[in-house]
Amino acid sequence: MKIGLIASGYNCDQFLAECVAGWRQFKAHGEHELVCSFVHNCFKENQELGFPLESNDKTMEMFDSYFSKGFLDYYDVSNKYLNEHQARNICLNNVLSSGVDYVWTIGLDEIYSFEDISKILKFVQMNPFITWFKVNYKNYVFDGNQWIDGFCPPRIFKVAAHGGLKELYYDDDFVYNDGTDYKAAPCLEVPRNIAHVKHMTWLHSNGKAKVEYQKKRWGEDGCSYSWNYDENKLIFNTDFHKKNNIPLPTLIKE
């Protein structure tokens, strides 16, 4: 199989090297061909928060290095603020032009091992009539030594279905050329005993900016986390959970 890996990144150097390590190993030694396309982009909501177009950490420098060393087959830099799906569509068009069989979307705080990737693709290969697959994550939060279960987003999408994969119309949401929304197509969840992927998500180290972004995007009460300005740390937004009648997540210690 030929796999197209796509991602959009901005100010994400904290876990970037760890994120791409498994993919670099797979590209060099894996059973299947991997075509990688990343785009550097600052989301539109961040423009309203005063963020510059260019990252102020080492993200762009690292992307440049991955491209020059051959891990990235395509690397684009957006010269304007794009929504996530608009940025990812740049990457999607790149990998589709390379004739990939599946498109795999990732966030650059998701840490797949070589074994995770290999086992997931074996599962995909065993289910050729399935159009898309969800992946289970361990969402590491706060100090990074505890995690939350239950996050299982769509990640892998078959290209040769419904006239071909066309584009993203929202963050992780695809439509096919015949107008079929991927949600209407057959899907499977990759079982946890095959892969339960490490996701360095809502942490004290990155939480303040994420809360500000989510509030700008979803409204003042639209984020399940809050930033405690007195203690300078991330906390659960209890008002959000009460308002939506959602129990607070269970924290699992490492």
Regions found by a protein language model. Give the residues of each.
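Catalytic-site signature of metal-activated, phosphate-bearing donor transferases
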Residues: 84-89, 111-254
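Short, acidic, metal-binding catalytic loop of nucleotide-sugar glycosyltransferases
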Residues: 21-33, 41-51
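Residue-level signal for alpha-helix termini/capping positions
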Residues: 24, 28, 96-97, 125
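A conserved hydrophobic helix/loop-capping motif in glycosyltransferases and polysaccharide synthases
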Residues: 3-15, 19, 26, 39
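Residue-level recognition of the N-termini of beta-strands and the immediately preceding loop/turn
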Residues: 2-3, 32-36, 72-73, 101-103, ...
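Short beta-strand-to-loop acidic/aromatic patch adjacent to the donor-nucleotide binding site
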Residues: 99-113
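Acidic-and-aromatic substrate-binding clefts and catalytic sites of carbohydrate-active enzymes
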Residues: 13-16, 79-84, 111
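Active-site-proximal specificity loops/subdomain of glycosyltransferases
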Residues: 38-100
